[in-house]
Amino acid sequence: MNPSKLEQNLSGVIVEMALKLGLNHAPLSLNYPCASLGRMLGVEADPQALKPALEAFFAARAGLYGAVHVEPHEDGFCLAIPAEGVARVVAQAPAAAFLRDLIQTAQTPGATADDLLAAFRRHSDRVHVEPAGNDEFDLLVYFEDGVPDDFRYCIDQHDGFASYHRFSREDYEAFGF
């Protein structure tokens, strides 16, 4: 089992959701497909293997996340993070400043892809940008050295504004964009 990938992913998703919703001290419920959880934990992507792995993961990190409830949901699991866990993760997350900047930029009326790229470049000189090469998105963007995070950001410019979607590297590759 490789828990660090799930820990990094959860940290990024919790911070992003808390910042977008403005709820740094509220519980969050996050739904993950079994395939993503299996890739992140390095275990078989079936519910019988994942449930005990998730319970062990959160038991070992109760000081950070609190008492997380792990429940089956459709083709994956719902991870219910209590308010105190959300607050601790947001306070400790190294990528919070970048995400705050990116979210504020994306929420600015008329924000363009260039505006979003500028947010990346305010936080690193090692920003990789390439055409996405698919019909879903215009650009693929990520930090070459994984700092401040290792997510893959897909930027789409449409209807006069730009938006982004964020994926773990493994999920991005598995989706085959």
Describe every region a protein language model picked out.
Residues 114-152:
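A cross-family detector of function-defining hotspots
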Residues 160-177:
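A short, surface-exposed interaction/processing loop segment used at functional sites
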Residues 28, 38-67:
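Charge-enriched amphipathic alpha-helical scaffolds
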